[in-house]
From Swiss-Prot:
This is 7-cyano-7-deazaguanine synthase. Binds 1 zinc ion per subunit. It comes from the Bacteria. One of its GO terms (biological process) is queuosine biosynthetic process. ATP binds at residues 9-19. SUPFAM superfamilies: Adenine nucleotide alpha hydrolases-like. The keyword Zinc applies. Keywords: ATP-binding, Ligase, Metal-binding, Nucleotide-binding, Queuosine biosynthesis, Zinc. It comes from Geobacter metallireducens (strain ATCC 53774 / DSM 7210 / GS-15). Transmembrane segments: none annotated. Catalyzes the ATP-dependent conversion of 7-carboxy-7-deazaguanine (CDG) to 7-cyano-7-deazaguanine (preQ(0)). Its EC number is 6.3.4.20.
């Protein structure tokens, strides 16, 4: 019998790869996505279309409005930076977002009787978000086992799986391709056009393009400002 696992699934490149890995490792994946007022909701639409074809047993979309909190270019009128990937934590950071997401995942996991949670965080080719670091994940896992009925009663130990955390974006892409992931059915851009095209200039687009260039594979998604993503990604490094 396959073990159940909750997989945080945004519809982006990393989380799609993470879902494929969970399934390949023999888990029954229960995908969880969020509609939280994000400006790049086209990513969520990809998640809705692809969760079950990707092998998810169930797909739960949690709805809440992070715009009430604000403080991020993804949930307010703050402009999304287009100058390149910097060294400081960017304004696209959503305050405590992974803590909120993982808490929802933990709650669902406890209800399902699942003790495994997958999240596609990465600490190499990323924008410097503090809630993507290994020490954060370790701290949340410890908290999960202290803060739940299942944890304190010893019914099992919750584990937070981060299979991408020490991989480069190119390595993530190669891994996904080896598992049959169709990256043309993913979305990464923080600031897409009204038609849903990726901008090609935000942090997320730049990291994605760089990853495909280093993997030696053309990015299959359409960009509003780039005619040849493979060439553009090499030039932007």
């Amino acid at each position: 019998m396959h073990k159940k696992a909750v997989v945080l699934y945004s519809g982006g490149l990393d989380s799609t790869t993470c879902l494929a890995i969970a399934r390949a490792e023999g888990y029954e994946p229960y995908a969880m996505s969020f509609s939280y007022g994000q400006r790049h909701s086209v990513e969520l639409e990809q998640a809705k279309r692809n969760a079950r074809p990707m092998g998810a047993v169930d797909h739960l979309v949690v709805e809440f409005d992070y715009r009430q909190v604000g403080g991020s270019a993804l949930t307010s009128d703050i402009a999304v930076p287009k100058e390149g990937v910097g060294s400081d934590i960017p304004v696209t950071y959503v305050p405590a977002r992974n803590t909120v997401f993982l808490s929802f995942a933990l709650g669902w996991a406890e209800v399902l009787g699942a003790f495994d949670i997958f999240i596609g965080v990465n600490a190499l080719d990323y924008s410097g978000y503090p809630d993507c670091r290994p020490e954060y994940i370790a701290a949340f896992e410890a908290m999960a086992n202290l803060a739940t009925k299942a944890g304190v009663e010893g019914k099992g130990r919750f584990r937070i799986h981060t299979p991408l955390i020490h991989l480069t974006k190119a390595e993530i892409i190669r891994k996904g391709l080896s598992l049959g992931v169709d990256y043309g059915r993913t979305h990464s851009c923080y600031d897409p056009t009204p038609e849903g095209l990726a901008c090609g200039l935000c942090d997320s687009c730049r990291l994605r393009l760089k990853g495909f260039a280093e993997a030696g594979v053309a990015d299959p998604v359409a960009y509003a400002t780039i005619k040849n993503p493979e060439v553009r990604s090499q030039e932007s490094e």
